Amino acid sequence: MKNAKKKNGAAAKGKGRATLSAQQTIPYLSMHPDGVCKLPGGLYTKTVEYEDINYSVASTEDQTAIFSGWSSFLNYFDSSLPFQLSFINRRSHSRSRYQVNIPKADDNYNSVRDEFTGMLKNQIAKSNNGIERSKYITFGIPAEGIAEARPRLERVEADVMGNFKRLGVPSEPMDGRARLALLHSQMHPRNREAFRFSWKDIPQTGLGTKDFIAPDSLDFRQSRTFRIGQYWGAVSYLQIMASELSDKLLAEILELDAEMTVTMHIQTVDQLKAIKTVSYTHLTLPTI
């Protein structure tokens, strides 16, 4: 089915460096039906998809409340619970992604409602330039095995979704198939084909989950760019060390008319350690 990908592999050739297959380049170890993913180093993760917060169009008072609530949400994660925020912009092949709900009524105007709904969907699609913007939070814990990790992750997941609910933000946990579908879409840019996968395919075919999501090839030989199949991409790294940041920074990046993925890897630092780090940085800063 996709065994040919193992032959093409990830072109990562160099001196004394073996070529990896496309599957071997994908760094997770196993994906479970309930959405628990095992990573190297005994780390287990889960992902929750959430919708946008209407921050930019809110009043100043509401923005303050939203910011305060979001800060409390982030403070839920202590130093033992690393997490990642992912913002993915993709070209839309269908306008059904945009949800506009005008309920039907028992009168003669449902045709007008349908027409108005279609018009709103078209306007939303045009305003986004055909870009679908999705948001995810992934959190992980170290554990000896899946039996230990699963109940702990489920508790964190329930807390995260409860915090989103208090913010008025709809959220939904991602099961294993949904996470695989997301990875598949990331590794097959602009692919219009639906993701075809069922857990019963694993024992029937003898393939692993990576065989269903891996691209034909991954090429990382260039220092600044990489290639997935026939598409080229680039990665930029930004380390944020500023004491203050504009609340528009992320929004302005995500509003670019481009397919891209922005990830924020966040590790809460113990308060005492943070104070020591800030004090040391202050002492070592050069004077002018």
Task: Name these PLM-found stretches.
Residues 1-286:
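Extended, folded cores of ATP/NTP-driven motor/assembly subunits in large transport
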